Amino acid sequence: MIASDGLGIAGVDEVGRGCLFGPVFAAAVVLSDHAAEHLQAAGLTDSKALTPSRRAALVPLIEAHAHAWGLGQSSARAVDRDGIRSATEQAMLCALQRLPCRPQLVLVDGVLPLRLWEGSQRTIVRGDSSHAAIAAASVLAKEARDALIRRLSNRFPGYGLERHAGYGTAQHRAALLACGPTPLHRHSFLRKLFATV
């Protein structure tokens, strides 16, 4: 029996799945029904629909009002070694394992279930737009990954990472052709884009 106040349910989402650079991040969030209403009234929705400043402002609210939350990540090397789906699932599993209590139900954004999760789960297409716990997870994962990429942009200048966060923009592709990949690029992704890399 799942708690009627929402506390037995965790929303989980990932960010950075399609990036050419850096890790894939995931977050898991447990919200009470009251916290979900409060956060939605404060503007919580899918992280992709929020401005960077609005997203950043929501992070301390989510952290303060969530019953529990956890972050996980899988490196570019794990993506290359295990494939993006497995690496994403590992990040999600890590985020779930960082929760203080095992959720009775996991709501997963998207269509693919977590093969590594042995408990109850439900996939929800566009769940980050319709379920507050998934939306909160998307915001925490996005902000955590973006903060890491900004720090890494100082270590790897010339790629414009601080502007595109590792996604395959024209600027990023041009920098890859000019400078070659860094150790934190996903080489398995680059082979699909550039036969010469």
Swiss-Prot record:
Residues 7-197 form the RNase H type-2 domain. Its cofactor is Mn(2+); Mg(2+). It is found in: Cytoplasm. It is an enzyme of class 3 (hydrolase). Manganese or magnesium. Binds 1 divalent metal ion per monomer in the absence of substrate. May bind a second metal ion after substrate binding. Gene3D superfamilies: Ribonuclease H-like superfamily/Ribonuclease H. One of its GO terms (cellular component) is ribonuclease H2 complex. Keywords: Cytoplasm, Endonuclease, Hydrolase, Manganese, Metal-binding, Nuclease. It comes from the Bacteria. Its EC number is 3.1.26.4. It catalyses: Endonucleolytic cleavage to 5'-phosphomonoester. GO terms for biological process: DNA replication, removal of RNA primer; mismatch repair. SUPFAM superfamilies: Ribonuclease H-like. GO terms for molecular function: manganese ion binding; RNA binding; RNA-DNA hybrid ribonuclease activity. A divalent metal cation binds at residues 13-14, 109. Signal peptide: none annotated. Belongs to the RNase HII family. Endonuclease that specifically degrades the RNA of RNA-DNA hybrids. NCBIfam families: PRK00015.1-3, PRK13925.1. This is Ribonuclease HII.
